[in-house]
Amino acid sequence: MVLASLSTGVIARIMHGEVVDAPVLQILAIKKINSAADSERYRILISDGKYFNSYAMLASQLNVMQHNGELEEFTIVQLDKYVTSLVGKDGAGKRVLIISELTVVNPGAEVKSKIGEPVTYENAAKQDLAPKPAVTSNSKPIAKKEPSHNNNNNIVMNSSINSGMTHPISSLSPYQNKWVIKARVTSKSGIRTWSNARGEGKLFSMDLMDESGEIRATAFKEQCDKFYDLIQVDSVYYISKCQLKPANKQYSSLNNAYEMTFSGETVVQLCEDTDDDPIPEIKYNLVPISDVSGMENKAAVDTIGICKEVGELQSFVARTTNKEFKKRDITLVDMSNSAISLTLWGDDAVNFDGHVQPVILVKGTRINEFNGGKSLSLGGGSIMKINPDIPEAHKLRGWFDNGGGDSVANMVSARTGGGSFSTEWMTLKDARARNLGSGDKPDYFQCKAVVHIVKQENAFYRACPQSDCNKKVVDEGNDQFRCEKCNALFPNFKYRLLINMSIGDWTSNRWVSSFNEVGEQLLGHTSQEVGEALENDPAKAEQIFSALNFTSHIFKLRCKNEVYGDMTRNKLTVQSVAPINHKEYNKHLLKELQELTGIGSSN
């Protein structure tokens, strides 16, 4: 067994600001420290054989090495990436060594003892601190920049900012007053507004990333107006003088115990030269459109495609908030000969120009499942790039311009409406005979059927009034309703429909369930009207429900076996309903007759 030699005396040089490449050190102790938020942090005692430093921290991404027992006492490690940061009021406190990447050279079980008799680096002799030839390192200080002159206050750095060395995101905590981070914007939300009893306002949020980690930042009201147009996704900025507080994990899934809030003193400057201290690029895990059909509902996905079709801008008003929303559906195609619908919202929908059929790259877009197909929706944490300068985009452009998008074989997104028969046509008896729904994933089919019976009992429930929540509320009395999901009390609620009915075709009858939107379409009334009638006007409710009896429709059905207690039931759910398009339906019947009789089609 050969033990690596420690980089003797190097700790004193590092802690006094010198850049040293890949120092080899020994871990003498490691201890979990208390954190003000729900996050693990580890402090280590580290030695170079001559000096030790008790103010060293592991970045959170290295916690797994501690959990796996790789960083035991006496382990010899090589520091691959690290930074030093001043912690304390006005930057006058202790300098902390933060390690973001390391390599285990010799496990502690091999070393078995402390190497040398190290003393604190603060006792280092002056000769140990003499300048040494610097080598390239990942912890290079940022050169101080001349202040820029701009009429927008706080948009650029000024003389009050100590830009001599940036701080890693992983080192930030509410106990620091002076710091500057250099970070890339990985995502940026649209402007969101709110209005309640305490007032009204607006906000937007962004996710920031450097080599050490990531953090969420939010700008409210005046800061929202000041910084929204300045901040651009994928650009790198110096940012300072934000407020730090424990992260609200209900709204952020980032691996950081804290989040930032912009204040009136916040300073932001675009970093135009990132060569000296590179910030990681945004990474894309691009998935072919054809693969999206096999992915889970609500999963996030990165993909790239050509915008082949652009839908009209649509506006609608939320019933509960009376807030207007705008959206636009576009169709993307790619070299897997597949197409998928992507929904844009807000300003993205209003400003989108697809007449030149650009390349569209999306990151973190959400998969929605509807009518047996999959579509994409650009959410607040998603990124959309138009004609990105990457090899995949250039290759896709060449494919499309040479006729590649002319024959798309696979439409991943479901088509809606009474005239579409892309889903397999089947009778209710055939669906049962073929044992649909018994696999791991649900099956889908459609049929023409008549409504026989509609149950009024339990046809609705009281739901959370928030536009993005449909959870059932609990009546607390005194006109107060609690939503467990939102963990909030509301003075009102909204009705949601859950209708069970018996439908039949010429082969069989089945009980099916339909949810809110389908129920409203079938009954011809809003859920609010139906709920109020069921609770307050039984005669009107009877009229609404009886009008549905003995009406025929095209039903698109989802079929899946579900377990209730120790019993398995085959459940049918109405995914969509449409009036009968007799011309299209007759075409289907003629095709069935031709297949049954073997008679070819005639003109």
Swiss-Prot record:
Q: One GO cellular component from the entry? A: DNA replication factor A complex
- Biological process GO annotation list? DNA replication; DNA-templated DNA replication; double-strand break repair via homologous recombination; meiotic cell cycle; nucleotide-excision repair; telomere maintenance via telomerase
InterPro entries associated with the record: Euk_RPA1_DBD_C (IPR047192), NA-bd_OB-fold (IPR012340), NA-bd_OB_tRNA (IPR004365), Rep_factor-A_C (IPR013955), Rep_factor-A_N (IPR007199), REPA_OB_2 (IPR031657), Rfa1 (IPR004591)
Output the superkingdom of the source species.
Eukaryota
Molecular function in Gene Ontology = damaged DNA binding; single-stranded DNA binding; single-stranded telomeric DNA binding; zinc ion binding
Which stretches of sequence are listed as region Disordered?
Answer: 131-152
Q: Which residues carry this modification: Phosphoserine?
A: 160, 420
- List the subcellular locations: Nucleus
Tell me which residue ranges form C4-type zinc fingers. 464-486
- Is DNA-binding among this UniProt entry's keywords? yes
Which ranges of the sequence are annotated as binding DNA?
179-252
A Pfam family that the UniProt record links to this protein: REPA_OB_2
Q: Name where it mostly resides.
A: nucleus
Keyword Ion transport included in the entry's annotation: no
Which keywords annotate this record?
A: DNA replication, DNA-binding, Metal-binding, Nucleus, Phosphoprotein, Zinc, Zinc-finger
Q: Which PANTHER family match?
A: OS03G0429900 PROTEIN
Q: Of which family is this protein a member? A: Belongs to the replication factor A protein 1 family.
Function of the molecule: As part of the heterotrimeric replication protein A complex (RPA/RP-A), binds and stabilizes single-stranded DNA intermediates, that form during DNA replication or upon DNA stress. It prevents their reannealing and in parallel, recruits and activates different proteins and complexes involved in DNA metabolism. Thereby, it plays an essential role both in DNA replication and the cellular response to DNA damage.
Summarize subunit and interaction data from the UniProt record for this chain: Component of the heterotrimeric canonical replication protein A complex (RPA).
Kindly provide the name given to this protein in its UniProt entry: Replication protein A 70 kDa DNA-binding subunit
- Recorded source organism is Drosophila melanogaster
Annotated gene: RPA1
